[in-house]
Amino acid sequence: MKPSEVSNEIRVAVLGEWVPPQLADVLALQRAEEPEIAAALIGGTADDQPAPQPGDGFDLALSTADRQWPGWVCEALWHDTLSIAVAKRSHLLAYREVPCCEVLKQPLIRAQSTAGEPWRVVAQRVLGDALQDREQLVGSFDIALTLVSAGYGIVIAPSARLAGYLNRGIAARPLAGTPTVVMAYLLHPRARLTEPMVRFIQRV
């Protein structure tokens, strides 16, 4: 796909079930500073709706995974730290940061939809590659956090992913000893970008 040389719209594909909260600030800034160029979001997150691919008519993409598309550049965009989601009555709330040894004593729950996200590799490494055989696998992040709220186990995830669930019967604590993780990537064509696209990327 080649970016349109004359367009009053920037089409941004959002890949995955999670939308980074920072995107709202970027869209608001775009609307305030360049209202004549609209930013349109497209995406496919339902099971029967495939994720957009290069050539599907978008200019830029945001992804939680490091995607390698021919002719596109993938750049780390937003970063975060790993946290533990627990039920609000959990004894783990006594810790300011939850030690890895305590995490491995708990029933662990993982959403299948997060399997390809790069922070999973960091979590595995920090916990000594002990997650693979210990986690109960469920279909979506929403289901995983519902089980956490009910006291069935805990979830490891970036802090920003958990923020929207803190009013749904869960609490979060940082996972001790973890490095910063990449939360989202920006993908753009390797070819020359239009001026509106360049300015949009600068706002990001």
Residue ranges and their predicted role:
Residues 1-13, 70-73, 94:
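Short helix-loop hinge/linker segments at domain boundaries
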Residues 7-68:
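Central regulatory/effector-binding core of bacterial HTH transcription factors
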Residues 22, 173-204:
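A late-sequence structural motif
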Residues 23, 106-130, 194-195:
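Secondary-structure junction motif
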Residues 33-41, 126-135:
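A local structural motif
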Residues 64-70, 120, 141-171:
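A ligand-binding cleft/hinge motif common to bilobed small-molecule-binding domains
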Residues 72-82, 86-108, 198:
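Flexible hinge/capping segments at coil-to-helix
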Residues 73-83, 159-160, 167-183:
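Short beta-strand->loop
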